[in-house]
A protein has these predicted regions:
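A surface-exposed partner-binding patch
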Residues: 1-88, 123
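Compact, glycine/acidic-enriched structural inserts
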Residues: 102-123
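Short, compact, well-ordered microdomains
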Residues: 83-85, 89-100
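Short glycine-enriched loop/turn motifs at secondary-structure junctions
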Residues: 48, 100-101
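Structured catalytic/translocation cores of nucleotide/phosphate-coupled proteins
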Residues: 96-97, 122-124
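Short, highly charged low-complexity linear segments
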Residues: 63-65, 92-96, 118
Length: 124
């Protein structure tokens, strides 16, 4: 996945979307997401996909996001959609309804890169 293409599409959709390299600690971020967060930290990014907002979480808020959604037992949450977490679990990207006693994972992509590519394709 060419992250620059994703960033360009996000900014083309809404010029207020802001990315910048992350100079802080990203140890919490899984290895497969580190290149994206290191080079294109989503400081303030919300995408509209089919009329639904997807908010990518900036690096400095990731720790709090994990705590907020700890009840779903996901490996790593990196975004939300109308309050529903979007997360990486065993390499795949999933979502589930927030606030439920027994969350049912819904697979969105086979990998983080595939998920970003799908967002690029859907925001054309």
């Amino acid at each position: 996945m060419d992250y620059a293409t994703f960033v360009a599409k996000a900014i083309a959709q809404d010029e207020r979307n802001k990315f910048e390299p992350c100079s802080g600690n990203i140890d919490i971020v899984p290895d497969e997401l580190k290149p994206f967060y290191r080079d294109y930290n989503p400081v303030d990014v919300e995408l509209s996909v089919n009329g639904v907002g997807i908010k990518l979480c900036p690096a400095d808020e990731l720790s709090e996001l994990q705590k907020e959604y700890n009840y779903i037992n996901a490996q790593f949450i990196f975004a939300t959609c109308n309050g529903d977490p979007i997360f990486v679990n065993n390499g795949c990207v999933y979502t589930c309804a927030h606030g439920t006693q027994e969350p049912q994972y819904e697979k969105k992509a086979e990998s983080f890169n595939e998920y970003l590519q799908a967002l690029v394709d859907l925001t054309c």
